Design a protein with these regions (language model features):
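Short beta-strand segments within Ig-like beta-sandwich modules, predominantly Fibronectin type-III
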Residues: 50-52, 507-510
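Extended acidic/polar, glycine-enriched regions
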Residues: 38, 44-106, 113, 127
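Mature catalytic domains of secreted/periplasmic carbohydrate-active enzymes
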Residues: 64, 84-86, 90-93, 310, ...
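Aromatic- and carboxylate-lined catalytic core of secreted/periplasmic carbohydrate-active enzymes
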Residues: 5, 11, 28-29, 346, ...
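Surface-exposed loops/turns
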Residues: 54, 66-67, 487, 512, ...
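Catalytic-core region of carbohydrate-active enzymes that cleave or remodel glycosidic bonds
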Residues: 293, 309-387, 393-397
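Non-catalytic, glycine-rich low-complexity segments
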Residues: 1-44, 48-51, 87-93, 451-461
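Active-site mouth of glycoside hydrolases
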Residues: 95-323
Length: 532
């Protein structure tokens, strides 16, 4: 019996450390063998689950969050794997390694080492199942794009533009079925696919891991969709025991990858065969088997999941009204990520043909209302290689403008952009919209602003009080705006054209009540930075 660490005994902070062990091959190791390890440093213990990787190889993965010496010891019901022990010296983090993303300042994000993380996502559901040539093209595209996260599926996807079969499957294939899209994703049983759900295909997961690591190398988080309804193979209709075993296997393999997020579902409410109790169980299994505390969410189609669930870290939402981020962040007390706001493109489906201008506006609407927004692209160029499904190249107009917005955000406050509560937009939203406005309340000065000279501030604005204010005027096209910064403070004033990607200094020094004049056009923003 031998054991080896694939890192040759070396390890570094926030990098996956792996132990590879040789064990039994008889019977069904996926069912029969239990393996875990305890990593210790002083009084601390971190328990990790092992998994079978095929061909008699068992693996344990650990994500060190502290430098120095760690010891490890295995526990298993297989004698050959039980009671093994060793140690590893964890060195300093390698360049670019910051650890998993966490929630910070209630509504924002940061890496585990405190480095700021700005959530700017895109969606390419099964880019990782398209063969090496297209997958490598997608990675090259992402390396030049502004996105810091990609939403992607663990399982393959059945839908229009997704009739090709993957090279591998997550479970042992018993009988191949049909692949043609017939206009409906319902009824996976009619396609004739059969799998042995008691036997995983390790090569499928190794390929997924390869792509996740390649995303990490270019600074992109993998927001992994664990379940989804778009299915011709039966993966959305496994039994509860099969679902649970899949979750445990997946978390054992991937929890030690620093750039993984758990998205329990894409459109959980389109899987009526799974009950609220099922989703609660899935959340708990995933969180219980992730000792490294990755972000976790549940994405909707129609009805929101209850984002107040204590183990949900952020609200992953499908809605076009990104401006509602201001309401949802207060409702849930968590970061809001509008992970589907429709797609820039030209396909027939209603959600897949908004303009680049609309996509950019939704990004800005989300940001100035304290949220984050995810991009998607669905251009019909006569092929079925569409970014939203398969990746490849990005051809839309929104991407460079999202990059422009990202730069503005990066240059903004380290704490993140929070809605400014004195604006008309904020106060109307907090009263439940125009239908619910109580006029007297609308004009009562917010706490702390009593006695301030009047200054109309209707536009949604985000920033940090007394330091930084970013207002977005959307499709409106005023020719002037009143400066509504706090009294007795001076600010620089910059006009931002979010579509033309320009910044024009309007004044080096303004104060409350000053009036700024500029050429009227839509999609403008005003940025005020304190100078005194």
């Amino acid at each position: 019996m031998t054991h080896t660490a694939t890192t040759s005994g070396a390890a570094s902070l926030w990098s996956t450390f792996e132990l590879s062990l040789t064990g039994p091959t008889d019977g069904n190791p996926f069912l029969d063998v239990e393996l875990r390890a305890i990593f210790r440093q002083g009084e601390r213990e971190v328990r990790v689950n092992g998994f079978y990787d095929g061909d008699g190889v068992y693996k344990l993965r650990f994500l060190p969050d502290a430098t120095g010496a760690w010891t490890w010891e295995t526990r298993s019901n297989a004698p050959a794997l039980d009671g093994l022990s060793g140690s590893v010296e964890v060195g300093a983090a390698q360049p670019g390694q910051h650890g998993p993303v966490r929630v910070k300042n209630r509504h924002h994000f940061a890496y585990a080492d405190g480095t700021r993380y700005i959530n700017i996502g895109t969606t390419a559901y099964v880019w990782n199942l398209q063969g090496d040539a297209l997958e490598e093209e997608t990675l090259a595209t992402l390396a030049k794009a502004p996105f810091t996260k990609i939403r992607m599926c663990v399982f393959p996807k059945h839908y229009r533009y997704n009739e090709n079969e993957p090279e591998r499957y997550p479970f042992k294939l018993v009988t191949a079925g049909k692949s043609k899209w017939d206009g409906s994703f319902a009824g996976a049983d009619k396609y004739g696919w059969k799998f042995d759900f008691t036997r995983f295909e390790p090569a499928y997961f190794r390929h997924l891991e390869k792509r996740i690591n390649e995303l990490a190398a270019i600074g992109v988080e993998a927001d992994l969709i664990i379940f989804h309804p778009y299915d011709r193979w039966g993966f959305s209709r496994m039994s509860p025991a099969e679902d649970d075993r899949y979750l445990r296997y997946l978390t054992a393999r991937l929890a030690a990858f620093p750039n993984v997020w758990w998205s329990m579902a894409n459109e959980y409410d389109l899987m009526p065969q799974k009950t609220p109790q099922d989703w609660d169980r899935f959340i708990n299994i995933t969180a219980d088997n992730d000792p490294f505390g990755h972000l976790l969410s549940v994405h909707n189609c129609f009805k929101f999941y209850d984002h107040n669930h204590p183990r949900i870290t952020h609200a992953s939402i499908q809605r076009s009204a990104a401006n509602m981020s201001v309401v949802w962040r207060e409702r849930y007390g968590k970061p809001v990520s509008i992970d589907e706001c429709c797609y820039e493109g030209t396909i027939a489906e209603l959600w897949g043909n908004i303009s680049g201008q609309k996509m950019v506006r939704r990004f800005w609407d989300g940001v100035v209302n304290g949220g984050y927004v995810t991009h998607g692209e669905t251009f019909n160029d006569g092929t079925d290689t569409i970014w939203w499904a398969k990746g490849g190249k990005l051809i839309g107009e929104s991407v460079p403008r999202i990059a422009f917005l990202r730069r503005i955000m990066e240059e903004g406050p380290e704490e993140g952009l929070d809605p400014i509560k004195s604006t008309g937009a904020y106060r109307i939203a907090m009263q439940g919209g125009l239908d619910n406005v109580v006029l007297q309340q609308l004009f009562v000065p917010p706490e702390g602003e009593e006695g301030w000279a009047p200054a109309q501030a209707w536009w949604p604005t985000a920033g940090q009080p007394h330091r930084y204010y970013l207002s977005y005027m959307g499709e409106n096209q005023p020719s002037e705006a009143t400066v509504a910064v706090p009294p007795n403070e001076r600010y620089s004033a910059t006009l931002i054209d979010s579509w033309e990607m320009t910044e024009t200094k309007l004044s080096d020094s303004v104060q409350r009540g000053d009036v700024l004049h500029f050429a009227p056009k839509p999609y403008l923003a005003l940025l005020f930075k304190r100078i005194d």
